[in-house]
């Protein structure tokens, strides 16, 4: 079975089940801004976790090279997220059919040409008018290294370097849309960063599945009708207010009000993919792990081979920036679009 690059589902679910996803979203009630994780050691925090994507967004103005104040760009990307399921832990009763959706399981097998698929997480992303998601690749995992204990920018650079495929745990990601909105298209680059971008409208009851650890992707701006985006900062919450309405709250203050059809609601599903029981067991038993020290030594040796690093010892921050600049190359923006 040859691997596939992506698969699109239209429709994804029978309509009654799709409407139930909206009721589940409403029932969850409150959605916080996506909180950046931290790593509990000095090297892990020399840079913000997704410094690579954030700096590229500020530097370039995003996919359409829009120039705005840093504070505005931050509000545009302080979107809302909550987790519905983690491993076998169901945090939102009723999400189980989506968590074990057979069409996702079958497509994941095709994406990585691996027959064993283990659902890992289900989470919701909600963007309000004026928000977008900068083009990026997701944080991969390796045997022995993951985002809970290692810098996210390092994991991303490791994957883009191509030097650590032996240890990578393939992950398939599905993104499903419910209710729909104007704008907020899913953009992805299935032919690589130099290829043409593909866009999918955020239409109700549709989905796409692909390898988001490898394929650059993002979310175009949700239509705002020229309305100014509210000053959304970490700590803000998107709260369901009943009768199809939502409000953004921060410190007891209501910053904005929206209705279904204005906000972009998506549910993401991620799963680990294994070739056989031995590969899965190697993850569980840590029998063939890569360490951070090993990863850094490998990257530094490769940088020297590329004549991008001398024999000197760089400060941690400078080394981190050198790694990001060399290995994580983003698609070019469309100037003047």
PLM feature segments, named:
Residues 29-55, 117, 131-149, 216-238:
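Internal, charge-rich low-complexity segments
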Residues 122-124, 131-133, 170-176, 183-186, ...:
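Conserved active-site beta-strand-loop modules that form the wall/rim of enzyme catalytic pockets
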Residues 1-102, 259-337:
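N-terminal auxiliary "cap/dimerization" subdomain that precedes the catalytic jelly-roll/cupin core
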Residues 163-168, 176-179, 258:
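Short, conserved, surface-exposed binding loops centered on an aromatic residue
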Residues 8-10, 116-125, 185-188, 209-210, ...:
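A structural signal for short, well-ordered beta-strand segments and their strand-loop junctions
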Residues 57-147, 151, 157-167:
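Signature of the catalytic double-stranded beta-helix
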Residues 5, 9-13, 92-96, 100, ...:
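Conserved aromatic-histidine-acidic binding/catalytic patches
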């Amino acid at each position: 079975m040859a691997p596939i690059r992506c698969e699109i589902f239209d429709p994804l679910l029978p309509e009654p089940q799709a409407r139930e996803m909206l009721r589940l979203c409403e029932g969850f009630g409150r959605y916080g801004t996506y909180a950046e994780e931290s790593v509990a050691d000095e090297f892990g925090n020399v840079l913000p976790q997704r410094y690579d994507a954030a700096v590229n967004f500020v530097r370039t103005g995003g996919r359409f090279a829009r120039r705005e104040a840093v504070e505005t760009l931050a509000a545009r990307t302080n979107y809302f997220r909550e987790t519905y399921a983690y491993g076998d832990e169901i945090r939102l009763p009723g999400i189980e059919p989506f968590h074990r959706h057979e069409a996702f399981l079958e497509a994941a097998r095709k994406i990585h040409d691996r027959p064993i698929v283990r659902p890992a997480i289900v989470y919701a992303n909600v963007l309000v008018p004026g928000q977008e998601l900068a083009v990026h690749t997701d944080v991969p995992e390796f045997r022995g290294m993951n985002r809970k204990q290692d810098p996210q920018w390092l994991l991303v650079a490791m994957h883009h370097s191509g030097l650590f495929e032996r240890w990578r745990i393939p992950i398939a990601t599905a993104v499903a849309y419910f209710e729909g909105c104007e704008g907020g298209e899913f953009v992805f680059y299935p032919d690589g960063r130099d290829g043409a971008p593909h866009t999918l409208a955020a239409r109700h009851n549709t989905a796409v599945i692909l390898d988001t650890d490898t394929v650059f992707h993002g979310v175009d701006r949700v239509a705002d009708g020229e309305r100014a985006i509210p000053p959304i900062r970490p700590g803000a919450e998107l709260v369901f207010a009943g009768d199809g309405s939502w409000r953004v709250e921060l410190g007891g203050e209501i910053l904005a009000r929206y209705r279904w059809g204005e906000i972009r609601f998506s549910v993401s599903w991620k799963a680990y993919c294994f070739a056989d029981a031995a590969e899965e067991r190697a993850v569980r038993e840590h029998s063939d792990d890569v360490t951070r020290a090993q990863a850094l030594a490998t990257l530094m040796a490769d940088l020297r081979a590329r004549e991008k690093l001398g024999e000197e010892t760089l400060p941690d921050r400078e080394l981190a920036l050198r790694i990001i600049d060399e290995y994580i190359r983003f698609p070019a923006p469309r100037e003047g679009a």
